[in-house]
Amino acid sequence: MPPMTRNTRNNPNGRFPGAFAPEDEDDLPKSKSQRKRDMTALQDIGAELESLPKDRLARVPMPEALADAIHAARKITSHEGKRRQMQFVGKVMRGLDDDEIATIRAALEGFKGTSKAETARMHLIERWRELLLADDDALTKFLGEHPSVDVQSVRNIIRNARKEKELAKPPKYFRELFQAIKTALEAKDADAAPDNAPEPEA
């Protein structure tokens, strides 16, 4: 029988402390490259927050310390000052827990989805405008899909938009047509909303 050493006395199985089972991966220290990737990801999130419109930023759930750091960064105009403040934003973000970071990520992803929908709507309005200016038959189709439209008003806007284009005038009616189409689409959406559905008869 081999002589008993201090280690074998403390560990009858002959293993060093902590050697009874493999370490959980979550308990292993992160590599330098992984820490760098995590830090870069947090800096990117901080930059997204700093660039958000004011109303959207207000809707992102975040700790007060981070909100204060972001608001301070938005007020700084000098490049170097902004850079230092954004470094501080990154430092604050490294102190957040996983749930807080996940909540912020979810809010930002939600905004991206909204932006895609807004972009699609913008393209639809521009496409309708292009069709209405190019073809009188397009107005008949548009009116069929948007019955709430003031027909005479839209006809006048289209006529004036065509005329100002021919005369190379500023696009006043061109912009008005965009707004008229936008209003018509919004009215159609409102009519289709569940709140506006007719109540069933008793």
Swiss-Prot record:
Compositionally biased residues, Low complexity: 1-13
Places the protein is found: Cytoplasm
Matches recorded under InterPro entries: DarP, DarP_sf
One annotated GO biological process: assembly of large subunit precursor of preribosome
Region (Disordered) location: 1-39
Pfam families in the record: DarP
GO cellular component, one term: cytosol
Gene Ontology MF annotations: ribosome binding; rRNA binding
UniProt entry keywords in alphabetical sequence: Cytoplasm, Ribosome biogenesis, RNA-binding, rRNA-binding
Lineage top rank: taxon: Bacteria
Functional note: Member of a network of 50S ribosomal subunit biogenesis factors which assembles along the 30S-50S interface, preventing incorrect 23S rRNA structures from forming. Promotes peptidyl transferase center (PTC) maturation.
Family as reported in the entry's similarity comment: Belongs to the DarP family.
Protein name: Dual-action ribosomal maturation protein DarP
UniProt source species: Cupriavidus metallidurans (strain ATCC 43123 / DSM 2839 / NBRC 102507 / CH34) (Ralstonia metallidurans)
